[in-house]
């Protein structure tokens, strides 16, 4: 609201954005472009719904590029290389990356984690619904290896965030720079960079290798926090906490034999 009032958009806009307007600014990032389009269109639709604008200038904008589904799976050797080198990075990025590898959480879930989301024994991270992608609370059991990392983290003096460079006032940020630093360290240690990968590929890789070692697909889905769809989502509300705990410990033992 304040943004729309500040720019003083006329209720009837003289110009509309078209697909042709997007040609010059495409730079090979269809995923990011699609997200910008989605949220910008939603913002203008809010203005239309509240009678601040007559029409949505982004209503007819389509995604010009298909978003390619990522299928990068890191091998166990690659994952162990990432783990080993991440351990040399120090706080916050070293333990942050290692916890993502052990739990399969999305990068924002540990980045925004609060200290009081950990139970007193540090056996699990309890993410409130308001902070989880599915809008449902998620309990993340911590393996023995994950508990060891969590117990070694420094306390924060000024705020709730576990991973922070501001004493807990703000969550850690700068993922791209941290990933670039990690890649550089890997190249220095091994003599060559790993084939292209992104942080989210760690989550997919964990799921793939968990299935390889015999963990049931529905337990893997529960570990990832995926919501059951259809009738199953309506009637099945068992948390699988014990099964998730066992599965994530098995995965930790596989990653760190």
Which ranges hold each PLM region?
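Short, basic (Lys/Arg/His-rich) helix/loop patches that form interaction surfaces
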Residues: 13, 80, 84-94, 103, ...
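Basic, Lys/Arg- and aromatic-enriched nucleic-acid-binding interface segment
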Residues: 6-39, 49-113, 121, 132-136, ...
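Short, polar N-cap/turn motifs at the start of nucleic acid-interacting alpha helices
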Residues: 116-124, 196, 215-235, 257
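Catalytic-site neighborhood detector that most strongly recognizes the C-terminal catalytic loop/helix
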Residues: 65, 73, 127-134, 147, ...
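Hydrophobic recognition helices of helix-based DNA-binding modules
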Residues: 40-47, 150-153, 210, 255
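Generic recognition of well-ordered alpha-helical segments
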Residues: 2, 38, 42, 144, ...
């Amino acid at each position: 609201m304040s943004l729309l009032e500040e720019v003083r958009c006329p209720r009837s806009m003289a110009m509309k954005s078209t697909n042709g307007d997007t040609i010059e600014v495409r730079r090979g990032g269809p995923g990011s472009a699609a997200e910008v389009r989605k949220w910008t269109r939603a913002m203008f639709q809010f203005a239309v719904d509240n009678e601040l604008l007559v029409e949505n200038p982004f209503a007819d904008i389509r995604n010009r590029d298909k978003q390619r589904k990522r299928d990068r799976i890191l091998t166990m050797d690659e994952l162990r290389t990432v783990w080993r080198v991440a351990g040399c990075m120090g706080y916050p990025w070293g333990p942050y990356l290692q916890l993502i590898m052990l739990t399969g959480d999305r990068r924002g879930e540990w980045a925004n984690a609060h200290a009081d989301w950990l139970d007193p024994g540090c056996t699990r991270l309890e993410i409130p619904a308001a902070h989880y992608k599915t809008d449902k609370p998620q309990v993340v059991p911590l393996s023995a290896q994950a508990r060891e990392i969590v117990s070694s983290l420094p306390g924060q003096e000024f705020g709730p965030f576990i991973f922070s460079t501001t004493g807990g006032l703000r969550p850690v940020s700068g993922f791209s720079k941290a990933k670039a630093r990690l890649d550089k360290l890997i190249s220095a240690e091994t003599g060559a960079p790993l084939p292209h990968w992104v942080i989210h590929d760690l989550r997919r890789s964990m799921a793939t290798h968990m299935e390889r070692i015999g963990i049931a697909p529905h337990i893997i889905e529960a570990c990832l926090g995926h919501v059951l769809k259809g009738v199953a989502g309506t009637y099945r509300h068992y948390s699988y906490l014990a099964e998730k705990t066992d599965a994530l410990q098995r995965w930790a033992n596989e990653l760190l034999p």
